[in-house]
């Protein structure tokens, strides 16, 4: 085909009505130095600049008066409609933040429902001079001021609540003059002494009202048992204080108050006569004081008890005012007998917890259970009271009998120092280890069971998996420790110095670290008992405390004769002189005669010398029998033969006839005669001769010379 016949490409120009679209590069001047700087900038830095620009625009919008007015109008319209969704609460908090930032910290009441000043502001203040007890008391007192404000008891003049925090130094904390009850916090309270001098100013520059503080100081000085004083004069209490009848026992609240004291208050208690009169009126146990034509005062050993009485005083006064107005006078009211119903009302209220203690293991003080409920209410509203609750609100989940109360064995965790901070990662690792140890130390018995797996479609799979199930055999299940440890110092004796307890604990921990083995703790019950040791069996070894040895029959011999006798003994031990056994009978007879004379209890002093001479001569002439009598255990055969032959011999003396039988294996107790020589009782048996001490000494000398 030729080129002329090929189809040509036809281009259609754009219609003239379409406008020209501006591109990005048409708006940018490439020679602009600002554009060149941004183009050469790194991407991360360019992104940071963009975020800063966006935040600047958001800040400008939030700080603009127009946005604040629009937001307030929106919230007002939503509140008029009655709806209160979560989004509205979020907008309300934003509005509170903006309004408080714009108006120097003063917020609008209609917009401050979601934002309140926290009561416990001590973490942000300088609290180095406060001890732990004072911090808790400050939080309690500030919470009590907030409750008085919420109940409508606040008054601009002479209405105060005070607490004594130190009985030794008479330090009292009270709210300063000019600070409303709704602004009371733990750090704004002022600490003064009993005469009104400031000890700790707190976080404000305001001063206390000495006129309003004078009744508190007078009560504290007259009643050392009082810790808290609450003084109010609401409409109901002021009205009842002006009645001649006073508080009438016409309601349960009035019966709970018990004895009520009345005092003609003149506006101040600075004079000594007035304080003496107040002391007479109060008495030792009165908890409610009526100031005539002024108001009411409640006393308490704790803050909770004082609040308990002031709350019932307010309720009793309101009931009385309404009853008098409705009945047309006091004469038309039914007045109860206070003494008759005191045991059912005041006695139960004074027992603590409104009678809850009668069937509960938790012992509550007067007004404490009600005060904790109000503190939980304030905490739920966001007041952050800082109150230390005694018991949790939510009851613990009931556990099965097989659950472990305490691990069966002691865990092997490493002890951490109390002062050193614990990292979160380390805490999580220890938590996992504790769970594992709790599982391993469980006293429950488990069985390994193969359970078939289930497939996705619901059918049973041929494969099985291992599952641990609790053993049904109750005999194999061991019980845990029945004692529940609620306090780490549960087994520490009472009235013990805490420093000594910590030192003892650290010492025990050190012993556990180094694995020291000791005999264990010493019993305090058996520490002072002296145990008598049983008498030991008779021993024939030479000792210093034993009975005195018999007189030495060889004391008159010379050294040469002793050496010759020693050599003779050695030859006999070596078996060199066996042919001389024929003279056994004669020598044995002489030995038996000597024994009868030395062991007889009727031996006389005149014959002692003859016996000793005969005894010494027999030992000098004695060969084999002497060796057997003074020998050791290796000569048992010869000794038995001697015993058999000597037993046939009898010796007749001038005093009495004694038949001697020598039994070598037996040992008898020695009985000494008055002269120190051993004697024999007729009821006791013979014993063999001991080895003389001088022979042992000679053997030792020979060994040393060798």
From Swiss-Prot:
List where Basic residues composition bias occurs.
682-706
Q: What UniProt keywords are attached to this protein's entry?
A: Acetylation, Actin-binding, Calmodulin-binding, Cell membrane, Cytoplasm, Cytoskeleton, Isopeptide bond, Membrane, Phosphoprotein, Ubl conjugation
The UniProt entry, under InterPro entries, shows: Aldolase-II_Adducin_sf, Aldolase_II/adducin_N, Aldolase_II/adducin_N_sf
A single Gene Ontology CC term: postsynaptic density
Using the UniProt record, give the first listed, main subcellular location: cytoplasm
Q: Which SMART domains match?
A: Aldolase_II
Known post-translational modifications? Sumoylated.
Annotated compartments: Cytoplasm, Cytoskeleton; Cell membrane; Cytoplasm
Q: Which residues carry this modification: N-acetylserine?
A: 2
Query: What's the impact of mutating residue 457 to A?
Result: No effect on cleavage by asparagine endopeptidase (AEP)
Query: One biological-process term from Gene Ontology?
Result: positive regulation of cytoskeleton organization
For the modification Phosphoserine, which residues carry it? 31, 42, 64, 402, 414, 423, 442, 461, 583, 585, 590, 673, 677, 679, 681, 683
Q: Membrane topology per the record?
A: Peripheral membrane protein
* Sites marked Cleavage by asparagine endopeptidase (AEP): 357
Q: Where is this region: Disordered?
A: 1-23, 471-495, 534-556, 574-610, 651-706
GO MF: actin binding; calmodulin binding; protein kinase C binding; structural constituent of cytoskeleton
Annotated region Interaction with calmodulin: the residues are: 684-701
Q: Where is this cross-link: Glycyl lysine isopeptide (Lys-Gly) (interchain with G-Cter in SUMO2)?
A: 484
Q: Keyword Membrane on this protein?
A: yes
- Give the quaternary structure: Heterodimer of an alpha and a gamma subunit.
Query: How does the record comment on the protein's domains?
Result: Comprised of three regions: a N-terminal protease-resistant globular head region, a short connecting subdomain, and a protease-sensitive tail region.
What family is this? Answer: Belongs to the aldolase class II family. Adducin subfamily.
Q: What does this protein do?
A: Membrane-cytoskeleton-associated protein that promotes the assembly of the spectrin-actin network. Plays a role in actin filament capping. Binds to calmodulin. Involved in myogenic reactivity of the renal afferent arteriole (Af-art), renal interlobular arteries and middle cerebral artery (MCA) to increased perfusion pressure. Involved in regulation of potassium channels in the vascular smooth muscle cells (VSMCs) of the Af-art and MCA ex vivo.
Would you tell me the protein name for this molecule?
Answer: Gamma-adducin
Organism of origin: Mus musculus
């Amino acid at each position: 085909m030729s080129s002329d016949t090929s189809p040509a490409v036809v281009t259609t120009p754009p219609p003239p009505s379409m406008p020209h679209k501006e591109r990005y590069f048409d708006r940018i001047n490439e020679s602009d130095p600002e554009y060149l700087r941004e183009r050469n900038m790194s991407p991360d830095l360019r992104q940071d600049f963009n975020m800063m620009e966006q935040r600047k625009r958001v800040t400008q919008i939030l700080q603009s008066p127009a946005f604040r007015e629009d937001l307030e109008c929106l919230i007002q319209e939503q509140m008029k409609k009655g709806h209160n969704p979560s989004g509205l609460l979020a907008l309300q908090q934003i509005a509170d933040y903006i309004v408080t930032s714009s108006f120097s910290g003063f917020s609008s009441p209609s917009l401050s429902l979601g934002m309140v000043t926290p009561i416990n502001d001590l973490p942000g203040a300088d609290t180095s001079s406060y001890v732990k007890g004072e911090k808790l008391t400050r939080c309690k007192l500030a919470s009590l001021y907030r409750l008085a404000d919420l109940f409508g008891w606040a008054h601009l003049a002479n209405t105060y609540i005070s607490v004594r925090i130190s009985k030794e130094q008479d330090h009292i904390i009270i709210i300063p003059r000019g600070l409303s009850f709704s602004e009371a916090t733990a750090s704004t309270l002022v600490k003064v002494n009993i005469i009104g001098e400031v000890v700790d100013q707190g976080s404000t520059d305001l001063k206390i009202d000495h006129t309003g503080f004078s009744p508190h100081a007078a009560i504290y000085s007259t009643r050392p048992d009082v810790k808290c004083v609450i003084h109010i004069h609401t409409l109901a209490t002021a009205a009842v204080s002006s009645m001649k009848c006073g508080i009438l026992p016409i309601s349960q609240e009035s019966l709970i108050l018990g004895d009520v004291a009345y005092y003609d208050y003149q506006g101040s208690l600075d004079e000594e006569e007035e304080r003496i009169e107040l002391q007479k009126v109060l008495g030792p146990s009165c908890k409610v004081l009526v100031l005539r034509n002024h108001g009411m005062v409640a006393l308490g050993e704790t803050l909770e008890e004082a609040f308990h009485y002031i709350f019932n005083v307010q309720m009793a006064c309101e009931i009385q005012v309404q009853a008098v107005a409705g009945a047309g006078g006091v004469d038309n009211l039914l007045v109860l007998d206070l003494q008759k119903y005191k045991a059912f009302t005041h006695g139960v209220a004074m027992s603590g917890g409104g009678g809850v203690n009668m069937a509960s293991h938790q012992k509550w003080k007067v007004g404490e259970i009600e005060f904790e409920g109000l503190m939980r209410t304030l905490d739920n509203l966001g007041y952050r009271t800082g109150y230390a609750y005694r018991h949790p609100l939510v009851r613990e989940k009931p556990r099965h009998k097989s659950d472990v109360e305490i691990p069966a064995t002691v865990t092997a965790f490493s002890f951490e120092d109390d002062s050193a901070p614990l990292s979160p990662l380390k805490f999580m690792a220890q938590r996992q280890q504790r769970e594992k140890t709790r599982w391993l130390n469980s006293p429950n018995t488990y069985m390994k069971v193969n359970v078939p797996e289930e497939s996705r479609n619901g059918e049973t799979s041929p494969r099985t998996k291992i599952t641990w199930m609790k053993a049904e055999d109750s005999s194999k299940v061991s019980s845990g420790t029945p004692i529940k440890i609620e306090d780490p110092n549960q087994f520490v004796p009472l009235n013990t110095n805490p420093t000594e307890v910590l030192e003892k604990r650290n010492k025990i921990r050190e012993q556990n670290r180094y694995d020291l083995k000791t005999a264990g703790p010493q019993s305090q019950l058996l520490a002072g008992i002296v145990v008598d040791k049983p008498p030991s069996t008779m021993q024939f070894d030479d000792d210093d405390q034993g009975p005195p040895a018999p007189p030495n029959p060889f004391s008159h011999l010379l050294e040469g004769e002793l050496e010759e006798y020693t050599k003779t003994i050695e030859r006999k031990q070596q078996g060199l002189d066996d042919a001389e056994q024929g003279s056994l009978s004669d020598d044995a007879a002489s030995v038996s005669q000597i024994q009868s004379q030395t062991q007889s209890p009727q031996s006389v002093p005149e014959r002692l010398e003859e016996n000793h001479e005969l005894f010494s001569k027999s030992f000098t002439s004695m060969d084999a029998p002497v060796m057997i009598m003074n020998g050791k255990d290796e000569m048992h055969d010869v000794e038995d033969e001697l015993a058999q032959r000597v037993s046939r011999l009898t010796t007749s003396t001038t005093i009495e006839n004694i038949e001697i039988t020598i039994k070598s294996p037996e040992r008898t107790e020695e009985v000494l005669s008055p002269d120190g020589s051993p004697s024999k009782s007729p009821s006791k048996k013979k014993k063999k001769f001991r080895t003389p001490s001088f022979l042992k000494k000679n053997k030792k000398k020979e060994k040393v010379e060798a």
